[in-house]
Amino acid sequence: MTVVDLSQTLKTGMRVYPGDPSVKIVQVHNLNREGWRLKNLSMGSHTGTHVDAFSHMDKNGNTLDKIPPDKFFGPAVFLKSTDKLPNNKGLIFGKDRLRIEDFNKIISAKPLFLGISINCDFPVPLERKLLQFGVIIFGNLVNVEKLPKKKIFMFYGLPLKIKDGDGSPIRAVAIY
């Protein structure tokens, strides 16, 4: 069995989307003083490798706490936008260029979810439209080049259960 970690490491000062809050991770308690470690995390809900809830770009979309956990994992395949898309699988794209014109092709495949590499050109209008059509989107995936090409694997990207959450950092993994 192979496990591929598809997640960015969260750290103070890491690159974030322009206009998003910066990441600050501050030590609050430590072993010498209190006998345990505890850090305060401050960041946006779409920082690093994350998932978008439908409410991220749709005023009528469900928030994270309203989406069942079984929607955040499933069989997936790593491919290019020019490939034939399999039906009823998660679709993971690497260094690619998706376009708004790809919307119908993606929707007709009835994807369980979309995974987008940190190196993928993914336009906001396409993201918005997919979320409005009920497609969960995992963003800023890394190490996708380690995934098997056009072969099915299991993808897991469970978010924190944030009340009224529009997104959440995740620990994304693929297992094959």
Go through the PLM ranges and name each one:
Residues 1-176:
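Active-/binding-site microenvironments in catalytic and ligand-binding cores
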